[in-house]
Amino acid sequence: MESLTLQPINKIQGEVNLPGSKSVSNRALLLSALAKGTTRLTNLLDSDDIRHMLNALTKLGVKYTLSADKTECVVEGLGRPFSVSEPVELFLGNAGTAMRPLAAALCVGQGEYVLTGEPRMKERPIGHLVTALQKAGADIEYLENTNYPPLKIVGTGLKAGTVSIDGSISSQFLTAFLMSAPLAEGEVRIKIEGDLVSKPYIDITLHIMKQFGVEVINNDYQEFVIPAGQHYVAPGDFLVEGDASSASYFLAAAAIKGGEVKVTGIGKNSIQGDIQFADALEKMGAEIEWGDDYVISRVGKLKGIDMDYNHIPDAAMTIATTALFAEGTTAIRNVYNWRVKETDRLSAMATELRKVGAEVEEGEDYIIVKPVPHLKHAAIDTYDDHRMAMCFSLLALSDTPVTINDPKCTSKTFPDYFDKLKALSC
């Protein structure tokens, strides 16, 4: 297995222009494909998850042109649901932002589809979405294990009316249903069962749907109404915001060992909830400055904090490794959905933090981290999870090297992450 050893970094200083947001990129690509008209997406993320979506759209008959650097994409919208004459198999890797929304979108089209992916994708639940779609008239069956991909879908359309969906495991199930609802036969009402996790990701979905001409009535996140007679319309130009989750590593690095770091491509008006990571970092003691299209983080005396991170689960992972540089104990609570991400992130995080000497308590939906004066040099396993690799790179800000196994797993969202980190290192 390939590995990368990062030597201790004395200081972090500089500016980073963020790659496009994965969450925004794949939502915008799908709606561009379904919309009437042509959409030009700029600052599109170039990564594995986006390539899986683009490859799927090609198989579904969508025409697009991609710039040489793959960050600009002009999509010719179909102006209708997907339709194929021959059965199509779509391999979606481990891209939840492609698997869930496409599963819903294909139900309203015509044709026969199989959705599959990497072995880990077959362990990531999709049952709550499938159940809701079936209640709305969709023809879906599990090809291997109940509640998990791969799926066989026969496009039959979605009925109008009221449907319930469990929001307690992943907000992607609701996002997927919301994005397909305007293509249903009439008005759709979606009632939420359980406590809806990751609400800011739903805000991203609603914001992008509005940019493509569809209004959704949000009744305090308990019910969503998609009025009949709406159609996706290309907005012309669509700028993909920088990835707020990716910003977290650089903001944290500056808080630990700045200098200062300025990240551009996001700012105080960002539609991404993960930008609230900067608020958590500020509570720990970092100095944060906000602009319209940038955030600056400066070094501070960090202290441990006890917080609920249900609203920003991806960025919360960065808090777990930042905690190693804080005074006192840090508690990250209400993050059960870490367990159904690219890997079981609660278990993985606890295991790897212990390798470097930290005291860790792992609960069903929380992790508590107590730092130690000196970290041990360890080889960090990344579990084919891009965020594990990027989070643990921060350990190089100590006086001990850190080895990252399989560093190229960052290609899921941030292929040149380690180059960007190196450029900031003094």
From Swiss-Prot:
A Gene Ontology term for the protein's cellular component: cytoplasm
Identify the keywords attached in UniProt to this record, alphabetized.
Answer: Amino-acid biosynthesis, Aromatic amino acid biosynthesis, Cytoplasm, Transferase
| Alphabetized PROSITE patterns for the sequence | EPSP_SYNTHASE_1, EPSP_SYNTHASE_2
Record's Gene3D superfamilies?
A: Enolpyruvate transferase domain
Active-site residues (renumbered):
D314
- The UniProt record gives the binding positions of 3-phosphoshikimate as K22, S23, R27, S170, S171, Q172, S198, D314, N337, K341
Chief location category: cytoplasm
- Residue sites binding phosphoenolpyruvate per the record: K22, G96, R124, Q172, R345, R387, K412
| Reaction equations catalysed | 3-phosphoshikimate + phosphoenolpyruvate = 5-O-(1-carboxyvinyl)-3-phosphoshikimate + phosphate
**Pfam name, any one:** EPSP_synthase
Q: What is its EC number?
A: 2.5.1.19
User: What job does this protein perform?
Assistant: Catalyzes the transfer of the enolpyruvyl moiety of phosphoenolpyruvate (PEP) to the 5-hydroxyl of shikimate-3-phosphate (S3P) to produce enolpyruvyl shikimate-3-phosphate and inorganic phosphate.
Subunit comment: Monomer.
* Protein name (Swiss-Prot/TrEMBL): 3-phosphoshikimate 1-carboxyvinyltransferase
Q: Which organism is it from?
A: Vibrio parahaemolyticus serotype O3:K6 (strain RIMD 2210633)
Gene that encodes it: aroA
